Amino acid sequence: MSERMIELKGIVKRFYIGMPNELEILHGIDLEVKRGEFVSIVGSSGSGKTTMMNIIGILDRPTEGEYQLDGVDVAKAKDKELSLIRNQKIGFVFQTYNLIGRTSALKNVELPMLYAGIGRRERKERAKELLEMVGMEERLSHNPDELSGGQK
């Protein structure tokens, strides 16, 4: 198993805003993230952080460059393989939460595990553990509108 989990080489991302206009957001980004390593992406508003995270999270593709995720060449992977990778290897905490409004905190945490094919009992136990880890053991049955911004 490779030490490198994420490897970007020469990543360029351009958006086309009508011919001949184009807007280049990422200009040849190189990044290597090793297994178990924590990385922060920081920069001013409009600097391309979200664009880069969308590429890393396989929500978008680069215009140019190479992207290897855990040894898989993302550019050459088929859609079905990319869906599996997203489900098993990539996790996102979105700025806008994307929680299901009429669903408890526990069920919102369980949902990705359902898509991963994890059984009901294990999902519930793991979701409880995760919520307890962040001090939300008293909020398991609360819906998103009953949670603070930080709890969401």
Feature names for model-found ranges:
Residues 3-152:
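ABC family nucleotide-binding domain
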